[in-house]
């Protein structure tokens, strides 16, 4: 998991007028971490700059958590639900904050403008200029949208510049399509979304998702088949524009194997499984099927009649529902990870452990070694050691310093360093002649050399 170098945010009212001073601050990288060179190429923030300007991750997490936890806050970004929010959860997890509560307690919520823009293009495109990428499909990259619509966004991927660009695009959608904007804002709430979903009748819905691809405007009609057997926030949806053959012909095990096979690895005669999970706690775009007007369906290349024919097939074959429930009853294949930093999703913390986390937060750094806490969760002890080592290394005794050095040697091993150097070499060949990029790559090389010794 990448670690953040910079945070930027600003509080606005519901009309996107800025009502507080913007916040911009940096995070100093820990000494057991080599930054992702690709990320540095995009942001332009070298690890040396982050070290010079940044606070430690504990303070970085505290400031973000404080801003996010103000009652009534809605956290809005651009692709934040799939990217930024994951980074936030992980730094909260490593810093002993509840990784989830900030986004729902005290009337708080989150929302993502990326899917709002996709929905606007698919359903109500008027009033916004939609740029195309080199393949002739609409581009939803923030810098492309701002340029096409005359929005100032001089330093794309600079965090504060991206914040202002996101605000400007949100204002534009609200102005151009106020009814759609308000509908999507109201339906960021999982209880509102839940009310749309009728599994018993398989009532079709319009769904916007990047998984559908730009060729059809990231849009389709879907039918809810069943709730996920283990995750109460996930509903199993069938893409009605897909080929129903696999659902009819394959058993649950065969469906599972094909579902988790990359599309470019399927044989020419193997249709993809037209199934996806929709997580109602991740602000998905769902609306009644009629929201996709015939003229917009035609523009996007979606055959509404074919979708209705497929819906008829689903209703005539109740065994399909049983198969997809069985498919998801067995966990998706994954590689277990022994690294405690990567174990955020290994389970929720107990109330007793949450109480211990609050004690850790309230304890002065110099008093952390003397804490005598009992944890029921196996992750907590190692997390606390790493928290001290990264943020307050002067609190480690001699044995702990040796232990941390061993951890660093294991993480920054020869294989990891070789991979880092190969990545730098590849980027050097890609950007040869670009002075700015060369300077960034030199900084990354120097930092790696200094870190590994």
Locate the predicted segments by residue:
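Acidic catalytic cores of enzymes that act on phosphate-bearing nucleotides/polynucleotides
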Residues: 186-266
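Long, charge-rich C-terminal accessory regions
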Residues: 229-407
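C-terminal non-catalytic accessory extensions
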Residues: 400-453
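Metal-dependent phosphoesterase core characteristic of DEDDh/y 3'-5' exonuclease domains
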Residues: 4-5, 11-12, 17-43, 66-178, ...
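Short, glycine/acidic-rich hinge or "gate" loops at secondary-structure transitions
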Residues: 160, 179-191
């Amino acid at each position: 998991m990448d670690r953040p170098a910079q945070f930027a945010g600003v509080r606005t009212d519901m009309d996107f007028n800025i009502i507080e001073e913007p916040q911009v601050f940096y995070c100093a990288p820990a000494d057991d971490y080599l930054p992702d060179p690709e990320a540095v190429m995009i942001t332009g923030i070298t690890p040396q700059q982050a070290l010079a300007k940044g606070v430690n991750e504990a303070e970085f997490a505290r400031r973000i958590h404080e801003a996010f936890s103000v009652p009534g806050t809605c956290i809005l970004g651009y692709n934040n639900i799939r990217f930024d929010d994951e980074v936030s959860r992980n730094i909260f997890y490593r810093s002993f904050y509840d990784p989830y509560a900030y986004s729902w307690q005290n009337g708080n919520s989150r929302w993502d403008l990326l899917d709002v823009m996709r929905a606007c293009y698919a359903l109500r495109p008027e009033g916004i200029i939609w740029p195309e990428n080199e393949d002739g499909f609409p581009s939803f990259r923030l810098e492309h949208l701002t340029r096409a619509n005359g929005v100032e966004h001089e330093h794309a991927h600079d965090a504060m510049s991206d914040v202002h660009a996101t605000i400007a695009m949100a204002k534009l959608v609200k102005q151009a399509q106020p009814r759609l904007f308000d509908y999507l804002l109201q339906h960021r709430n999982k209880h509102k979304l839940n009310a749309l979903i009728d599994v018993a009748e398989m009532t079709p819905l319009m769904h916007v998702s990047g998984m559908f691809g730009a060729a059809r405007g990231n849009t389709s009609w879907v039918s809810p088949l069943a709730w996920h057997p283990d995750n109460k926030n996930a509903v199993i949806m069938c893409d009605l524009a897909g080929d129903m053959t696999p659902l009819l012909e394959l058993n649950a095990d065969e469906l599972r194997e094909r579902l988790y096979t990359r599309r470019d690895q399927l044989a020419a005669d193997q249709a993809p499984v037209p199934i996806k999970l929709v997580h109602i706690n991740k602000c998905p775009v769902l609306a009644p099927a009629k929201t996709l007007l015939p003229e917009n369906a035609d523009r996007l290349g979606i055959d509404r009649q074919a979708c209705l024919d497929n819906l008829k097939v689903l209703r005539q074959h109740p065994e399909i529902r049983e198969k997809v429930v069985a498919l998801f009853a067995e966990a998706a294949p994954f590689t277990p990870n022994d690294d405690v930093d990567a174990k955020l999703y290994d389970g929720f913390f107990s109330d007793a452990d949450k109480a211990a986390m609050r004690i850790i937060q309230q304890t002065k750094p110099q008093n952390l070694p003397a804490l005598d806490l009992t944890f029921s969760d196996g992750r907590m002890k190692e997390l606390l050691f790493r928290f001290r080592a990264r943020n307050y290394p002067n609190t480690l005794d001699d044995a702990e310093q040796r232990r941390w050095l061993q951890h660093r040697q294991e993480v920054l091993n020869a294989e990891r360093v070789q991979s880092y150097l190969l990545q730098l070499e590849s980027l050097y060949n890609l950007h040869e002649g670009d002075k700015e990029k060369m300077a960034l790559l030199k900084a990354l090389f120097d930092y790696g050399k200094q870190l590994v010794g």
